[in-house]
Each structure stands twice: as structure tokens, then as C-alpha cells.
């Protein structure tokens, strides 16, 4: 640093260390100009000048070094790490951190976290991580503060499951560490701008069933029932959707939310987008969402296809209700599906089955392959001191697949 011809850094780092630079050294402030840094460094190298990029802590841990490595020759880089603020925070608290998950909540400020927030929210990765890890080390941002993180835990129903520690101004004047804060307390506190957060579980994480939940696990419309994809049809439909851990799923006509919520548990690194037009059913699906404890599920009140244009292209689409828009929804789903994706639909009436078959036939020339399975299940029922079988209504499960080699397209 003392011999560098060019020193690049943030406003604060340059001001803090400017007295160490050699006389005549050029300085570049990267604040708001990160994309220019590789060009500045490359230009200095071509001019046979030495260049130093200042970073705090370990630049290989959510720092600038990986970015520079992607845009410059790796062999041209020499990384000199310091202690990271996360290391220092754990040392202050005496906490082992080899098994902790590190999460950064830097990014565009999307405001307060709401249940069902989309993947673009700055707290989304953290909301997912708290479901899967016992201890988390969080690099905060000016918008996503410790207090907002605490409010996120409360919004997700995890206020009694985690404790927090907030380390402020580490290795600086005014250093302070708040240990064992309850989220309810931290949610209303103010902290110094320079801080990191540590989260750890105060009670064991639940290990929920991911697939094949009984119908009784879901709240349903009372006194009349029936607006639920029942266990047998749900299990077959989810199997035919060919879900992966990171799948993007659409659930059109969510009703109670049973298919979409189970898909969310099966796709912990993916996301489920659900829509329901009936207000009462939407409220029930929201109730089930709150009970299921998944953060990768967004539920919308509306009638498809309105609103679907803003959803990301799906790997799988489930249509449980069409609101009279079936042919158009099928065409939209097949157009938006990613290559190798699957469309699954459930029907109990001849009219909807015939409409679906006609719509799918019209897409056969595009390489769409489809089939129909009639599911006829019967469940045992007591009769006196014996048992009999009571038939459930037959369900047609209609499945269509998009060729793996076919390019996806937008709306």
C-alpha cells in the first residue's frame, strides 16, 4: 500500500489510510463505481503501475476479491486478508463459528420484510437460511439493519426460536457488543451503522414432513369441504411435476394451498408462486402458509392470468382451478415453461378434461408430449366392528412435458 501507484477504495477506507500512501499516488473512490474497478486496475497494470484495492476484513468473504477475480486474471491478484468482522464478533462472544452459515443482506433496499416476499428482497436469503441452520453470521446493510432482521424473524413466526447478538464498531472507538437479545427486544432498538449480527437457535428446529401430508394437516373451508387437492391426487401430481431442490413452481388456483405449500417444502432452494381468485379461499391458504413455516412461497389474490407476467419462468406449473380460462392458461404455461418443465392439471369434470385435451393437441406440433391418468382411490371406513372401502371421487391427472432441448420464451 505504501508503494502503490494507484490506490482504490471506498470513501471511508481512503480517508482512514490516506496518510499511508506514497506521495503522488493516485486515488480512486469506488463508492457507486464498482463496475469501473477492474478497468482501473487493468489500465494501471498496462501502464506498469502497481495497484492496491482496499477492503475491510477478509475480501474473499462476501468482499470484492471474488468480483475482481472474475473480471481480471486470477494470477494478477494477490490477496492479503485481515480478520473479518465476523471472526472478531464471534471471538468477543466466545462462539465457535466453524459450523455457522454466513449470509449477506447487502443489496437494493426493498423495505420491511413481509411474509411471502419475493426472492429479490434483500432479506430473502436470510429468511431461507434461518429455516435450515442453527447458527448464522449476518453481514448487515444500511437498510437491512439488526432491528429489521429482528422484525423479519417476528414476521416469520420465529421470534421465540432465535436469540441475537449485535456487535457494533468492532476494533473502533465505541465498540459495543449486545449479547443474547430477544428479537422482540432488538426489533425496536437503534444500532451503530457499522455492525454485524449473530443469530442462533434457542430451541431445536422442527423437522416437518415434506411430502404426503394428510388432508387434515391443512385448514379447509367450513362447514363445506372439498376445495383441497386430496392426498392421493396431491402425491401423484407432485411426483409428475418432477421437482428439484431449486425448482420455480406456479400454483394456479391455489385453494387451500396444499399443492404449493408441499412443493415449497420439496424445493427449499426454489420458490413457489401461487394465485387464488376467491377471497375466502385465499385467506385459508394464507392461514396454511403461516402454519407451514416456509419462506419460499408467495401467495397472491387475483384471477390468472392477470399478474403472471411478472412471475419468473417456471420449472413446473400446477393448475388446480382455471376460473374459465383453461385454454389460455395452458397456452401460457407451455409458453413460459423452462426447457424440460412440466405442466400438471387436475380435473373432476368431463368438460374441463375435454377442454384440456383439445388445448394440448394443438401444441403437439411444438413437441409437447402429454398423457392422462385417471386416479380412483378408496379409503377404508369403519362399519360396526368391521371396515369397508368408501370410494373417493375420480380425478383426472393431466400431465404435459416441454422438451428439454426447447428454448423457453417470455410472455
Task: List PLM regions with ranges.
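Class I S-adenosyl-L-methionine
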Residues: 2-88, 263, 269-272, 276-279, ...
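Beta-strand/loop-alpha-helix module characteristic of Rossmann-like adenine-cofactor folds
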Residues: 6, 76-77, 86-219
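Class I SAM-dependent methyltransferase SAM-binding "motif I" and its flanking Rossmann-like core
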Residues: 57-133, 305, 366-390, 394-399
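Core SAM-dependent methyltransferase catalytic element
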Residues: 196-202, 382-411
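Conserved class I S-adenosyl-L-methionine
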Residues: 246-255
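Glycine-rich SAM-binding Motif I of class I
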Residues: 257-261
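S-adenosylmethionine
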Residues: 277-279, 298-379
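Conserved SAM-binding loop
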Residues: 285-286
